[in-house]
Amino acid sequence: MMSTLFHPLRVKAVEPDTSEAVIVSFEVPPELREVFGFTQGQYLTLRGDIDGQDLRRSYSICAGLDDGELRVGVRKVQGGVFSNWINAHLQPGDTVQVMAPQGRFFVPIEPGSARHHVGIAGGSGITPILSIMKTVLAREPRSRFTLIYGNRQLQSTMFKEEIEDLKNRYMTRLVLLHVFSDEHTDSPLGFGVMNREKIGEFLGTLVPAASIDHAYICGPFQMNDEAEAALLAAGVPEERIHIERFGVALPSGATAGEVGAVVHQALPGDAKQARITIVRDGLQREITFTEGQPSILDAASAAGLEVPFSCTSGVCGTCRAKLVEGEVRMERNFALDKNEVAAGFVLTCQSHPITERVILSFDER
């Protein structure tokens, strides 16, 4: 059973990576090492009180499994209260409330396999892909990794020195392909925007689609969609494409701080009132949902239940639970794939009850 409790962790280090990003390392006491054991590509949910607000945000782990460290990369975001606070104010020795690692943005390691893994990253989307890349190179000695990495310019590139060190260590197994939107390079392929056309150029030349065993995509919302479309058009099977989303599509001119959670609306067919049983840590608690409440997550929080959540936008998947009984409708879903939905998993921050009786388990995640 995956823990969804917060634990106080001491900040070991806050290291500047670029002018807009820091790397935060945590000290994990011996009694919590099992709880904070992670799989490459997973994320941590941090919690903090900032200007009187109880905020939670998820940040991807950037360490490989063999690094012996727990660390995340945090980039400043225009209007992003938590990320900007971390960059400006978090210090070594501070204590942060941290939830155990979560996420399914990975493929199990196969030490004996000879596979070609491809990462397509944009900006801070490199963070989970770096974790995957380091782990694959260390634990699948016959496999190779190709990274297509988009940024505005070299100076704003996160983890550039660490990635170059990896290239020097795995010269025959790691291929790095940088793309800059604001800085020309010697190769026309290396200049431009990470859209479907640009990624398609790579798939038709330097990174033949037929050679790809698994592709990992993480970056801005539109880049994710366009990279997926390019891979599918090139013939990469859908089940070999893995996507991690950090946010929703922003309207033109909007900032991350201006676009919050989705506006929920009751629809015909939604239950006007429902009895919801919440299962967490083996305990059951019944609450009443009324039509005016935005979601089951909101109803649970209003009833005083401590339930896991982070973005409340249907993106991160922290609020995921298993539908044991009844039927719900999700407003939107960017975190669960079709197999997970078919298996009964829902995002409680987006869920409205349809039946008058619903049982949800946070212990089955």
Summary of predicted features, one role per range:
Residues 301-303, 308, 318-365:
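Iron-sulfur (Fe-S) cluster-binding segments and ferredoxin-like electron-carrier domains
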Residues 40-42, 60-65, 290-296, 335-337:
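A short, sequence-level motif marking secondary-structure junctions
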Residues 269-312:
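C-terminal accessory/binding modules appended to enzymatic or scaffolding proteins
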Residues 84-268, 275-277, 284:
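FNR/FR-type flavoprotein reductase catalytic core
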Residues 1-3, 10, 20-22, 233, ...:
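Iron-sulfur (Fe-S) cluster-binding modules
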Residues 2-95, 99, 112-115, 151-153, ...:
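Ferredoxin-reductase
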Residues 65-68, 110-115, 140, 353-362:
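Ligand-binding loop in jelly-roll beta-barrel domains
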